[in-house]
């Protein structure tokens, strides 16, 4: 339950989690959040909703870093305490914490501070590199396109694996084949008009898969310019 914005700003977020869990056919419900909504009261409701995993995406390890990168005044120490509280009541909830290397000052040990601070409070913890997914946007500090989010050499792909295991549903019901399609150039259906199974098995997505398999992703303008497929997907 996440795409282009902060999911927990949606007043119906917890209801969405409960609805998804009540179906009984979903392996995992998760979200990625900046964690600004966390705190006593909300934390209990979050755990009670049955959500399986949250990924906390943070902007640094001090209030000063947040002001520099996120341009907001942020009480970092208070945030850590809110995460600590969530961890203490989490039950089966998995908590992952990530940040990007470009937001840490390695010369003064902020990478170590990140691990020391969140390591005891998380089931998974990651420092990622910024990778440019969209040629329309300049990303300051992004690693070279031949290096992935973890500094490994990328393997060029001719077929995007997203097409065969995922869909991305926007807030208005428009369905894209992947989360990178932020401007919906590849819209393949609308849940207000047809079921998700009909879209998954539909002609538009089938044709897109065919283009990738037989011509390569470069034959699709939106896919050919994508950086994420090479740096952020598995074979």
Residue ranges and their predicted role:
Residues 103-106, 126-145, 182-185:
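Flexible glycine/acidic-rich beta-alpha junction loops that bind and position SAM and/or redox cofactors
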Residues 1-124, 128:
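Radical SAM/AdoMet-radical enzyme domain recognition
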Residues 170:
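Short, acidic, Ser/Thr-enriched surface-loop or helix-capping motifs
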Residues 174-175, 179-235:
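Flexible mid-to-C-terminal extensions adjoining Fe-S/redox cofactors in radical SAM and related proteins
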Residues 35, 101-103, 130-133, 181, ...:
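Short, solvent-exposed coil/turn elements at secondary-structure transition points
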Residues 161-163:
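Short, small/polar residue-rich loop motifs at catalytic or cofactor-binding pockets
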